[in-house]
A protein has these predicted regions:
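Functionally important transmembrane alpha-helices
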Residues: 201-265
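Membrane-interface helix/loop boundary segments of multi-pass membrane proteins
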Residues: 10, 156-181, 214-221
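Juxtamembrane helix-loop-helix connectors linking adjacent transmembrane helices
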Residues: 38-62, 83-159, 166-171, 302-306, ...
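Membrane-embedded alpha-helical segments of multi-pass membrane proteins
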Residues: 65-70, 140-147, 160, 203-207, ...
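Small-polar-interrupted transmembrane alpha-helices in polytopic inner-membrane proteins
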Residues: 113, 150-151, 174-191, 205-209
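Hydrophobic alpha-helical transmembrane segments
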Residues: 21-25, 61-62, 102-107, 143-144, ...
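N-terminal, membrane-interfacial amphipathic/helix-forming hydrophobic leader that caps
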Residues: 1-94, 98, 237-319
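Membrane-interface helix caps and helix-loop-helix hairpins in membrane proteins
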Residues: 190-199
Length: 319
């Protein structure tokens, strides 16, 4: 293969694999720089350890913001420098239908979790009751304040995994490779969570990555996957009282309390539904629903931003 073809595609742009490599390295550097700056700030201003702060709810929010900021800065830079794209191409533009996509995604995410919970009830593994141990005020605060927390967390992960990495492979006509290369790291990133059931957890989280990638591809924006992602977590933790990817500290006074009688292969045990078969079934159905439904479609503007770069280049030359 000629050096020209090894590095550049027929549109004269750096190939998608090299673009992804640049994004990954730049993201790691920028995220580390932001992390170092925050560590200094915590020690000087808060007079405490960075580790202690990051384990708190406030620290969780800060980590989500760092993830989002680093992925957004690097994604915008790669898009602008490597592909001549505006910041709107990353998928957060208030394009026509963005609010509808966010709302539909929120409904889809919440309903999908409820379906998984119903499977757990039908299998006699999950038993729900109202949380009588918590006051209405505490429950209300949990429902209210965890919503923006889960939105921030989902925004960071969507920006990183369904942002520039997936989008640049889509423009290179390597969509399925992009789905693979974003869904598996997305799953691997959750393996450090508490109470992981490694095989099932990885498989289910990878399936969730495919689901969220499908949501992006159907609309070519991040509003639909954001809606799905945050509502899935919020419904699971704040409403149903289930562990969210093994984490329970984020929703201290959920609306419902759950008794998990297992078996763990069905319900996920201490990791929550995402470690069990009820989640696998719900995700498979949700993927088909999002991919096959006819009422999800991208705006012309967002479709153009992820158009085939080679075909687009030929069109410009021909014009």
């Amino acid at each position: 293969m000629e050096t020209h073809n090894l590095f550049l595609n027929k549109a004269g742009r750096l190939r998608s694999g090299w673009r992804l490599g640049i994004f990954v390295v730049a993201f790691a550097v920028v995220a580390k720089l932001i992390e170092m700056a925050l560590t200094v700030i915590v020690r000087l201003v808060l007079k405490g350890s960075a580790e202690g702060f990051l384990s708190s709810s406030a620290g969780f929010i800060v980590q989500a913001l760092v993830l989002f900021a680093a992925a957004a800065i690097v994604g915008w830079g790669c898009g602008a420098l490597l592909e001549d794209l505006p910041a709107r191409a990353l998928g957060w533009a208030n394009h026509r239908g963005w609010l509808r996509d966010l709302g539909l995604g929120s409904i889809i995410g919440a309903v999908s979790v409820l379906f998984a919970a119903l499977l757990g009830i039908a299998g006699r593994g999950l038993h729900f009751s109202l949380n009588a141990a918590a006051t209405p005020s505490a429950i209300g605060k949990t429902l209210l304040f965890t919503a923006p927390l889960f939105v921030l967390a989902a925004s960071g992960e969507e920006m990183l995994f369904r942002g520039y990495p997936l989008q640049t492979f889509t423009r290179a006509r390597l969509t399925w490779l992009g789905i693979f290369l974003t869904s598996f790291p997305f799953a691997a990133a959750h393996l450090a969570n508490p109470n992981v059931v490694r095989g099932v957890t990885f498989a289910n989280t990878a399936l969730a990555g495919v689901w969220l990638a499908a949501a992006y591809l159907r609309t070519r924006s991040l509003w639909l996957p954001l809606g799905i992602h945050w509502a899935w977590n919020w419904m699971m933790g704040a409403v149903l009282g289930l562990p969210v990817s093994g984490i329970t500290r984020l929703a201290p006074a959920s609306l419902l309390r759950v008794q998990d009688t297992g078996p763990a292969w069905l319900t996920g045990g201490a990791y929550g539904p995402e470690g069990g078969a009820i989640c696998t079934i719900a995700l498979l159905i949700a993927i088909v629903l999002v991919w096959r439904t006819s009422w999800l479609k991208p705006s012309e503007e967002m479709l153009k931003f992820t158009a085939d770069e080679i075909r687009e280049q030929k069109s410009e030359v021909g014009g």
